[in-house]
C-alpha cells in the first residue's frame, strides 16, 4: 500500500486559478522572448551559425562539401579560409 506524499494531484493543479495566472504570463513571455532571440539575429551570434546571406559569398558560390576521406581537415581549412 502506497503512502501519501503530500503532493497535490495534477487535476487539482491545472484547475486552480493560481496555475493559470502564472502560466498565462510565462508561456506568452517565453514565446515572445524566443521570437525576439531569432528575429534580432542574436541566435546566429550566440550559436555561431552563418546568417542566410552569408552561406554563399561572391568568391565562393559552390556548396562546401567535404569529399576527401583521408584529408578532411585540409578541406575544412580551405573552406574556413574563405570566411
From Swiss-Prot:
Principal location class: plastid
Pfam families: Cytochrom_B559, Cytochrom_B559a
Lineage top rank: taxon: Eukaryota
UniProt keyword terms in alphabetical order: Chloroplast, Electron transport, Heme, Iron, Membrane, Metal-binding, Photosynthesis, Photosystem II, Plastid, Thylakoid, Transmembrane, Transmembrane helix, Transport
The keyword Transmembrane helix is assigned to this record: yes
Classification via PANTHER family: CYTOCHROME B559 SUBUNIT BETA-RELATED
Entry-linked NCBIfam families: cyt_b559_alpha (TIGR01332)
Protein name, as recorded: Cytochrome b559 subunit alpha
Originating organism: Pinus thunbergii
Gene: psbE
Amino acid at each position: 500500500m502506497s503512502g501519501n506524499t503530500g503532493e497535490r494531484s495534477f487535476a487539482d493543479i491545472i484547475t486552480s486559478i493560481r496555475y493559470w495566472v502564472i502560466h498565462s504570463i510565462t508561456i506568452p513571455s517565453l514565446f515572445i522572448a524566443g521570437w525576439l532571440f531569432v528575429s534580432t539575429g542574436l541566435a546566429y551570434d550566440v550559436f555561431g551559425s552563418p546568417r542566410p546571406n552569408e552561406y554563399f559569398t561572391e568568391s565562393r558560390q559552390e556548396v562546401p562539401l567535404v569529399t576527401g576521406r583521408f584529408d578532411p581537415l585540409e578541406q575544412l581549412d580551405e573552406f574556413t579560409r574563405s570566411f
